[in-house]
Amino acid sequence: MTTPYLFEDSESFARKLDAEDALRGYRDAFHFPPGPDGKPVVYLAGNSLGLQPRNAARYIQEELEDWARLGVEGHHHGRHPWLHYHELVTEHAARLVGAKPLEVVVMNTLSVNLHLMMVSFYRPTKQRFKILVEAGAFPSDQYAVASQVRFHGYDAREAVLELKPREGEETLRTEDILETIERHGHEVALVMLGSVNYLTGQAFDLAAITKAAHAKGCFVGFDLAHGAGNLRLSLHDDGPDFAVWCSYKYLNAGPGALGGVFVHERHAHTKDLPRFEGWWGHDKQTRFQMGPTFSALPGAEGWQLSNPPIFQLAALRASLELFDQAGMAALRAKSERLTGYLEFLLDRLPEGFVRITTPRDVKQRGAQLSLRFRGEPQGLLKRLGDAGIICDFRKPDIIRAAPAPLYNSFTDVYRFVKTLEGHARE
């Protein structure tokens, strides 16, 4: 246990922490599903699908009304003209990931954006053709990387280089990542890692990895699916070439929601960087002249293909406004304390009942703790559900619990662990 807080194992202490929480009011900005008893559930699955912001339905309804009232004229008129609607979330998203607005665009979904970024930043040569990834990355990332390698005529078994934990360990050591880059960097075209591993909950040192990879001449990209809205990110300063993320997890924009893209400012005006092109990435001043020659917008917007879905943007806007109001510094501070309290309580359960596989160092994790339990985990998951507690299961034997600082409370964490304790003592 490495958290610097003094905690107590009592419901009164959990309620005291909630009363002192400056962010507690944001909980009321979300809809909580009812549990079996009709009361709001303890929802610890924001790392899988975030809760619905109360403003989401209103924002979507506004656009439905403008569509009914204006038809095609809604692109230029209405409360929020659709032609520029995506720009309403650009600055919010940029602050969220520590970037400049020029470097960020909201579009598509994560796997689509990852492919678009690899078109530009995976440029294999005979000597430098490998992609460095983490073993056990989210499957869609694995599929995308392997298919890009095959598209360029290489065998994925030779061109995909995996980072694996040491024998007997479950997470990667930063020094091992950096040593692998130093040893193999001359043959690596792209370093492509997650910011937080979806299964272990381990967060990586983006700045150190980027610096090491750039020193060896590699492009660098990150999947922020479990980082955006969870970690305090500094993409511009850390300097990766690109990053992609989804917004249905910690960003609470709904199932299948739009993703985001970061392209570093140094590439903003690079005309000869290959990319797939579409009309929405064309210069706004001449887009509707419908000319035959593509002229890319500067920055991340130049990678857009199509005009974005307005209703999805409306849902995302409802959530990003809350993040902007709360601020990632305050949210991350609460998150460290909230997950630290979860860790403290789990450590007090009967010995051998549960093992935390996520790093104990708060700098190497976000909100999520990945848990391995003695016995069959899916039965325990059902018991939690029957008690009005929602977390999720990942094969082979991991239950993930992720208290989200925007809407979870210390009492939520206490109730979760006390339910586990009842199961452990039976």
UniProtKB/Swiss-Prot annotation:
Swiss-Prot/TrEMBL GO biological process terms: anthranilate metabolic process; L-kynurenine catabolic process; L-tryptophan catabolic process to kynurenine; NAD biosynthetic process; quinolinate biosynthetic process
Cofactor: pyridoxal 5'-phosphate
InterPro entries hit by this protein: Kynureninase, PyrdxlP-dep_Trfase, PyrdxlP-dep_Trfase_major, PyrdxlP-dep_Trfase_small
Cellular component aspect of the GO annotation: cytoplasm
Recorded superkingdom: Bacteria
E.C. designation(s): 3.7.1.3
HAMAP family documented for this protein: Kynureninase (MF_01970)
Name of this protein: Kynureninase
Organism: Myxococcus xanthus (strain DK1622)
Source lineage: Bacteria, Pseudomonadati, Myxococcota, Myxococcia, Myxococcales
